[in-house]
Regions:
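Short alpha-helical elements
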Residues: 1-177
Length: 177
């Protein structure tokens, strides 16, 4: 009886380790199925504020968007596949959250050469932080709108917004509880 329980436990640990390796390679495998290299060289970074319920353990207030809750920070490749992810309370700035996401996932970002960000990531401190984490060869590009109060789809920026839409479509992620 004891031996069977021990074998069962060891088997579960092996399966968990196998699953961990498997999930880490999902993005690379998906990119290879599309005929691309497993590692991306260009990432698009953005953040999204999401409402919390009143009983949630972690929450903050994003004064810019007037949302009480959390903030999701993601860096996706040109196909919309996530390469770096971080979840913070809403008061964390986009720049700090993006640096946290890149720091968490830096081992898988060794071949990245450029980041495309919106105007929320402007500033030399952010660029220096990215270069400290990923290397001096990284270029940070800021996508700017040409006209102040008009809607215009910005090339490549819509990809990260589509990735957020994929997350929102998952009913378990529509509100952080």
């Amino acid at each position: 009886r004891c031996t069977r329980t021990l074998r069962s436990g060891v088997s579960r640990v092996r399966e968990a380790a196998c699953w961990s390796r498997h999930s880490k390679n999902q993005v690379g495998a998906a990119r290879e199925r599309q005929g691309r290299n497993a590692c991306s060289t260009h990432l698009i970074v953005d953040a999204q504020s999401v409402k919390n319920t009143d009983t949630a353990a972690f929450k903050g207030y994003d004064a810019g968007k007037q949302v009480s809750g959390i903030k999701r920070h993601i860096a996706v490749d040109t196909q919309g596949l996530p390469h770096a992810v971080a979840v913070t309370t809403a008061e964390v700035t986009d720049r700090k959250g993006a640096l946290q996401a890149l720091q968490r996932c830096k081992c898988g970002l060794k071949q990245v050469q450029s980041l495309l960000c919106d105007s929320g990531y402007v500033g030399r401190p952010f660029e220096q932080g990215v270069q400290e984490i990923l290397g001096e060869h990284i270029t940070v590009q800021i996508a700017k709108r040409s006209e102040l109060h008009s809607f215009k789809v910005m090339p490549k920026r819509w990809i990260v917004e589509r990735s957020f839409a994929w997350l929102e479509k998952n009913r378990r992620l529509w509100k952080n509880c």
